[in-house]
Amino acid sequence: ENAAVHEVPIHDGVRTERHKLMYFPRNREWNLYDLLTDPNEMKSLHKDPAYNNVLAGLQRRYNDIRRFYDVNPAVIPNTRGDESWWRERDQAKKAIVKNGDIDLAFIGDSITQGWEGNGKSVWNKYYADRKPVNLGFGGDRTEHVIWRLNKGQFNNIQPKVAVVMIGTNNTGHKMQAPAETAAGVERILEIMKEKSPETKVLLMGVFPRGRTPHDAGRITNQGINQIIRRFDDGNHVHYMDVGNVFLDDEGNLPASVMPDALHLSEKGYELWAEAIESKLSALGL
């Protein structure tokens, strides 16, 4: 069965009888068209000084509508069931958790899934004898994790500790506002507490991305972390930002740690495991 749904932006622009404004969140750019002189929308006028007042007015209208409808896809459960590998992995993970004998769960995206790839030997060294499960799915955003948690991946387990890191694809795919991504993370924590109130959650700060400190994606991830660190309640949720262990003295991401400035090498997984080991022990694992 194909359980997929189509994700369609509810509001990606506004228009009047004459003008049309479009917003592109991935690169945070606006396009403005004069439908009277350019009915086929061939040339954007958003940088034309003659249209400054029109642009400003439509931007205000756009933002007012967004606030009114409170549109945030990061908190709306969303499946990727149209992708066969994702669907098969989902079914396989549900089979693993069905018996409930799990003490340690890792939840996230491709960086977490990578414990089965570049991080496999490190995983075996640190976690193989701790009744673990890897619930990382490459390409997932917060909304996909919400869907998975609600659809069986967290129904039969009561892990002692769950390591959660999610959000970098909200940045990479959409350049979503940090507050929106953080709201998705918060919803994930709420679901986990509802389903397994005794589980201690080690909430990871979203790892740095991009080769340099000035990378737009890295700055956005830092914005997410500034919000989600407040979710640490000292009891159920424990926040930990280990991003600095991956950086060199200039704040750059070495290729030896993240070859593509996003995903970890074996060395990167070793650094991650070393950074959280004492915390896992303190949480009772």
Give, region by region, the residue ranges found by the protein language model.
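C-terminal cap/loop subdomain of S1 sulfatases and analogous C-terminal strand-loop tails that border
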Residues: 1-31, 35, 40, 53, ...
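Structural recognition of the beta-strand scaffold that forms the well-ordered cores
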Residues: 20-23, 31, 103-108, 131-136, ...
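Extracytoplasmic/secreted proteins, especially bacterial periplasmic and envelope-associated proteins
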Residues: 53, 57, 106, 140, ...
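N-terminal secretory targeting modules
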Residues: 70-107, 111-125, 281-285
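Acidic/histidine-rich helix-loop elements
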Residues: 73-80, 116, 134-141, 172, ...
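Oxyanion-hole/transition-state-stabilizing segment in secreted/luminal serine hydrolases
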Residues: 113-128, 142-186, 191-195, 202, ...
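Catalytic His-Asp segment of secreted/periplasmic serine-dependent ester chemistry enzymes
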Residues: 208-285
